[in-house]
Amino acid sequence: MFTSAHANRSPLTSASVRRPSHSVVEHSATGLISEIVYREDQPMMTQLLLLPLLQQLGQQSRWQLWLTPQQKLSKEWVQSSGLPLSKVMQINQMSPCNTLESMIRALRTGNYNVVIGWLTDELTEQEHERLALAAEEGHPMGFIMRPVRNTSQPGRQLSGLKIHSNLYH
């Protein structure tokens, strides 16, 4: 699993984000769009990376939105994963085009601390810019989940992980 070259860009810092309706602590890592490319035959790797973050974000007052193509989150899985059932929303059976537009709208609202969307194709620079601007406006974290394609691309890393975060530096 790896993140894309344009992942983890955040134009905001914790000092520059202040809203009366949410505490600064809730916005310490906001306005972030990351792309997680994963292997479908190894779902545990993705869960090991994302679940601790999602559990921590679940303690905040805002919702978590999952835009899934076909899978439906089970109530049992959400609870056993330590996620707050009362703060997890899911919209499933969306086409990739609708997923991107729905992500942009959801990121802008400020109602969610995280928006997770599954896409099959890489984003264009323009699509990524639209997502980044929406995240800057609404202050959530956005995760684009994309499965690895079997065709190898020359010069591109096919496994590994890069994490860039101003939380740890």
From Swiss-Prot:
Triggers of expression? By DNA damage, as part of the SOS response.
Entry-linked InterPro entries: Cell_div_suppressor_SulA, P-loop_NTPase, SulA_CellDiv_inhibitor, SulA_enterobact
Q: Alphabetically list the UniProt keywords.
A: Cell cycle, Cell division, DNA damage, Septation, SOS response
Q: Which GO terms describe its biological process?
A: division septum assembly; DNA repair; negative regulation of cell division; SOS response
Region of interest (Lon protease binding), residue spans: 162-169
Q: Which residues does the UniProt site feature Essential for degradation by Lon protease point to?
A: 169
List the residue ranges of the region (Disordered): 1-20
**Biased composition annotated in UniProt, kind: Polar residues:** 1-16
Q: Which domain of life is it from?
A: Bacteria
Can you summarize the PTM annotation of this record? Is rapidly cleaved and degraded by the Lon protease once DNA damage is repaired.
Which residue ranges are recorded for the region named FtsZ binding?
106-112
| The protein's role, per its UniProt record | Component of the SOS system and an inhibitor of cell division. Accumulation of SulA causes rapid cessation of cell division and the appearance of long, non-septate filaments. In the presence of GTP, binds a polymerization-competent form of FtsZ in a 1:1 ratio, thus inhibiting FtsZ polymerization and therefore preventing it from participating in the assembly of the Z ring. This mechanism prevents the premature segregation of damaged DNA to daughter cells during cell division.
* Family according to the record: Belongs to the SulA family.
NCBIfam families documented for this protein: PRK10595.1 (NF007892), SOS_SulA_coli (TIGR00623)
Its quaternary organisation is: Interacts with FtsZ.
What PANTHER family has UniProt attached to this entry?
Answer: BLR3025 PROTEIN-RELATED, CELL DIVISION INHIBITOR SULA
Question: What is the recorded name of this protein?
Answer: Cell division inhibitor SulA
